[in-house]
């Protein structure tokens, strides 16, 4: 079996792992939730949830991954001293494979819209923009092609390995993503009436805070950091023994949150400048925002044209940094467990994800019969991973590390064998034994409508 390699620099660790967390959800979900749930009040609650749930969950996967120094399934075997917990790694790999399949569909739409923006296809009135999306997404050919193209883009990064593929790509994609985001934020905040959008996003309104807002903040903290997918565990297996896990996790959380807030500053000022109250999800980025950009920059068509291109380029980059990490989970499992080359393992992962992606794409209108329990196949995949596999994986990870793995082993990883101060270790252990699992259980109940 070939040498698995590791990250070559601290910057590579931070940018690659932050890239796995930064994705389309930062753009189409966090800003909307912040604006609707009290602005800065929601952000403060979100930070608390990150401390209670996000950081302990991330550190748990980091510890398992770095100590195991292998794919997720084998990492759990190493810490458990046998195969009893190996299913956790396999469950994470399956979860990420399913997510990559349907995520690539939406990422493929972003590629199409980037191309359409370049050739000027998405400029028109509101009805035209809406019909364009409905017609395109239900087409049996084009979305499938773009889905496969996006998965292949991901494949050709992952197949090059950790340093030459994942790390090198992250060092290019993440700074470029940040620059594009800043450019659009400046343009958006410069529009007449943009101040109302900034106020809507950032002005604290504690009157909106209730138990549902608390649960929404918990859920956002959980899903934003890719917990429960074995992604963080897999990336941590490429960390060096000198990597400060606590510091790295804190930096990644800050980057993820800053980008999400900047995404809000990109969306709301432009939307409020033309009197639009944005929604969330795919309709936000494929219907609402094209209309907003068309109307907001109507007096400056050249600027509007450039902003549209930059926006969809931004979405493609955000999606790609996430899909790279998802692909790597399965690739590592395949080539290490089957004792084959990385190239062969990557192709197995790519083919499986392409099959899932094709079914998800066709279920969006071209073949409506592709459904389960009254929901299209893409939605079923989304619900199965978000409502079951991810919360279950993260919950069991906390129990595994908090109660099953020897305390000294966890302490040694937390402190880099006592070369770092371990004052926060008792707090971390208490969190993953009691607080974080309780938070995940609340998310699980909320997902199923019990709370």
Give the label of every model feature segment.
Residues 1-28, 57-62, 66-79, 83-90, ...:
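Membrane-interface "cap" regions at the ends of multi-pass membrane proteins
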Residues 2-5, 32-37, 67-91, 104-163, ...:
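Inter-helical loop and helix-membrane interface segments of multi-pass membrane transporters/permeases
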Residues 2-3, 7, 167, 171-320, ...:
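Membrane-embedded translocation segments of transport machinery
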Residues 5, 34-60, 142-143, 389-393:
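Extracellular loop-to-transmembrane helix junctions
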Residues 6, 12, 20, 144-145, ...:
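Loop-to-transmembrane helix boundary motifs in multi-pass membrane proteins
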Residues 12-47, 236, 247-250, 254-257, ...:
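Transmembrane helix-boundary motif of multi-pass solute transporters/channels
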Residues 320-325, 346-349, 353-360, 364, ...:
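Hydrophobic alpha-helical segments of multi-pass membrane transport proteins
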Residues 376-400, 421-451:
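A generic transmembrane alpha-helix motif of multi-pass inner-membrane proteins
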């Amino acid at each position: 079996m070939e040498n698995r390699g590791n990250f070559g620099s601290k910057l590579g660790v931070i940018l690659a792992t932050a890239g796995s967390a930064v994705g389309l959800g930062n753009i189409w979900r966090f800003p909307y939730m912040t604006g609707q749930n009290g602005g800065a009040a929601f952000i403060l609650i979100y930070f608390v949830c990150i401390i209670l749930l996000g950081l302990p969950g991330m550190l748990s996967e980091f510890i398992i991954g770095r100590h195991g120094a292998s794919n997720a399934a084998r990492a759990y075997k190493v810490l458990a001293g046998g195969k009893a917990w190996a299913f956790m790694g396999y469950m994470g790999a399956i979860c990420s494979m399913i997510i990559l399949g349907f995520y690539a569909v939406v990422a493929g739409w972003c590629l199409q819209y980037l191309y359409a923006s370049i050739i000027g296809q998405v400029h028109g009135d509101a009805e035209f923009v809406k019909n364009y999306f409905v017609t395109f997404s239900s087409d049996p050919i084009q979305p499938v092609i773009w889905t496969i193209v996006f998965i292949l883009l991901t494949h050709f990064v992952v197949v090059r390995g950790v340093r030459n593929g994942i790390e090198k790509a992250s060092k290019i994609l993440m700074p470029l993503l940040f620059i594009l985001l800043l450019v659009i934020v400046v343009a958006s905040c410069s529009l007449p009436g943009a101040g109302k959008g900034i106020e809507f996003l950032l002005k604290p309104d504690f009157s909106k805070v209730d138990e549902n807002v608390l649960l929404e903040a918990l859920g956002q903290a959980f899903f934003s950091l890719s917990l429960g997918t074995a992604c963080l565990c897999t990336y941590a297996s490429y960390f060096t023994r000198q990597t400060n896990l606590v510091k790295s996790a804190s930096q990644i959380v800050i980057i993820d949150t800053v980008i999400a807030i900047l995404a809000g500053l990109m969306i709301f000022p432009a939307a409020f400048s033309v009197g639009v109250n944005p929604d969330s999800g795919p309709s936000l980025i494929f219907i609402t925002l094209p209309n907003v950009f068309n109307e907001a920059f109507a007096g400056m068509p050249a600027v509007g044209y450039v902003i549209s291109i930059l926006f969809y380029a931004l979405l493609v980059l955000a999606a790609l940094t996430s899909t790279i990490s998802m692909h790597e989970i399965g690739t590592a499992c395949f080539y290490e467990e089957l004792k084959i080359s990385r190239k062969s393992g990557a192709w197995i992962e790519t083919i499986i994800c392409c099959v899932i992606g094709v079914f998800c794409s066709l279920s969006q209108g071209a073949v409506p019969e592709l459904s389960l329990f009254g929901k299209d196949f893409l939605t079923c995949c989304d619900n199965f991973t978000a409502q079951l596999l991810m919360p279950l994986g993260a919950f069991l990870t906390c129990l595994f590390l908090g109660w099953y793995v020897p305390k000294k082993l966890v302490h040694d990883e937390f402190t880099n064998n006592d070369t770092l101060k371990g004052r926060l270790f008792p707090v971390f252990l208490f969190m993953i034994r009691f607080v974080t699992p309780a938070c995940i259980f609340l998310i699980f109940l909320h997902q199923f409508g019990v709370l």
